[in-house]
Curated annotation (Swiss-Prot):
The keyword Nucleotidyltransferase does not apply. Keywords: DNA-binding, Repeat, Transcription, Transcription regulation. Pfam families: TBP. Belongs to the TBP family. It comes from the Archaea. It comes from Picrophilus torridus (strain ATCC 700027 / DSM 9790 / JCM 10055 / NBRC 100828 / KAW 2/3). GO terms for biological process: DNA-templated transcription initiation. One of its GO terms (molecular function) is DNA binding. This is TATA-box-binding protein.
């Protein structure tokens, strides 16, 4: 089983642009169940059930998608929004570029970790560990540029990745680093 098969993607945040300008009041009427309260938040919030995602739509035409577990769900979500807006006679781009901003994933090293020893071994320039403030160790990986949160249970949360393969690279790197110093 490859490392990628043991990694669970929990959330993908992606952005796109659907137009130069959008009338959010008109969109609020077109998207049943949407939330638009401009005095509280400048964007419109719309939640989908399938795939289970949410989008934030802004007057500038920018759209953020969150909650997707895979890239297909991001694409499906944007396609659904485009389709619904076009049906409501709202002009939007047909095939906008989608940019992944962040992928959050979890991984289990299947071994309890001594975070104090790890903090000493991995070098203070890349590590933050203050157990009084937060129970996890923050490990900033330079290549790929991601942040790993390591917990005593052996669970690892990876954030900051833009592509799925970056998560796998980071997991392989941290495993090698910990094996090299005999901590797993």
């Amino acid at each position: 089983m490859s490392e990628m098969e043991k990694i669970t993607i929990e959330n993908i945040v992606a952005s796109t642009s659907l137009a130069e300008h959008l009338d959010l009041s008109k969109i609020a009427l077109a998207l049943e169940g949407s939330e638009y309260e401009p005095e509280q938040f400048p964007g419109l919030i719309y939640r989908l059930q399938e795939p289970k995602t949410a989008v934030l739509i802004f007057r500038s035409g920018k759209v953020n998608c969150t909650g997707a577990k895979n890239l297909d769900d991001v694409k499906k979500t944007i396609d659904i929004i485009i389709d619904k807006l076009k049906k409501a006679d709202i002009e939007v781009y047909d095939n906008p570029d989608i940019i992944v901003q962040n992928i959050v994933a979890v991984y289990d090293l299947e071994s309890n970790l001594n975070l104090t020893d790890i903090a000493m071994s991995l070098g203070l320039e890349n590590v933050e560990y203050e157990p009084e403030q937060f129970p996890g160790l923050v490990y900033r990986v330079e290549e790929p540029k991601v942040v790993l949160l390591l917990f005593g249970s052996g669970k690892v949360v990876c954030t900051g990745a833009k592509e799925e393969n970056e998560i796998e690279q980071a997991v392989i790197k941290v495993k090698k680093d910990l094996q090299k110093v005999g901590l797993i």
